[in-house]
Amino acid sequence: MQGRKGANTLGRSLEIDLLRSFVVIAEVRALSRAAARVGRTQSALSQQMKRLEDIVDQPLFQRTGRGVVLTHPGERLLVHAQRILRQHDEAMADLCGTGLTGTIRFGCPDDYAEVFLPPLLRQFSSQHPQAIVEIVCGPTPRLLEQLEKRAVDLAMISLPDDGANDDIIRREQLVWIGYPGLEPAHFDPLPLALSDPDTLDHIAACDALHRAGRDYRVAYASSSLAGLIALVRSGQAFAVMTQTAVPADLAIVNGDPRLPPLPAVGITLKFDRKRPSHLTAAFAEHIRAVLPML
């Protein structure tokens, strides 16, 4: 096997510790924050990455005024690193015992739970079969309240995608949805089924319609996603949700020029980073590794 400069690569190996540090830096895009997360000094982390670059014979990072970004070889390595770490952890859990034990209370919005939780929980359970994950569903503002009360240990939440937040794990586009064949142009004002008034989908819908000069009325407001979807299925209102979570029997509405485009939202994790349990930290790292690939 030959490297980029023709050197023989048979004597080289991608060390697990180096790959773990690399993935964390790739996620937070800043050495200082990455060093705090992995429990090393910034100097030690820099030395680790220099060693990894020497092993792969490629530059992996480019420094910017705000931190670091991955080079093209770095982006390629990230895909391999996430897969290698996942398989390594699964093998260790299988061969060395039952993995972590205990209970974690995990908060997640309904639309994310529907789409993302099955694969996330399935893979985590294969690594830690004795761990129990209790699910608490609710909109982001309610989950943040639960975190403040320590009623949940870890929460997946939405936040505005302003392009400057390094904590975003995945981005999701907000879309208008309605019952197939139902035209928003036939309604004035436009009837809406929205989540709680302090949620991003509610705020985004009202702001967009206000800027477009489109009259609307909130026909139904609730933190229950099932209730919102039921109202849309009845043909009584239109709603806003992430594109990934749109049910197969409902339609994304994009043919009305008076129905303005909506922003994207970011997904991140919130928990007590100063004193997380081993189980909380492990589940958070699992989500960070797997969620971008779902």
Curated annotation (Swiss-Prot):
Domain HTH lysR-type: 14-70
UniProt GO molecular function: DNA binding; DNA-binding transcription factor activity
InterPro entries for the chain: LTTR, LysR_subst-bd, Tscrpt_reg_HTH_LysR, WH-like_DNA-bd_sf, WH_DNA-bd_sf
Binding region for DNA: 31-50
Superkingdom, taxonomy of origin: Bacteria
Keywords noted in UniProt: DNA-binding, Repressor, Transcription, Transcription regulation
PANTHER family: HTH-TYPE TRANSCRIPTIONAL REGULATOR LRHA-RELATED, TRANSCRIPTIONAL REGULATOR
Family: Belongs to the LysR transcriptional regulatory family.
Protein name, as recorded: HTH-type transcriptional regulator DgdR
Species annotation: Burkholderia cepacia (Pseudomonas cepacia)
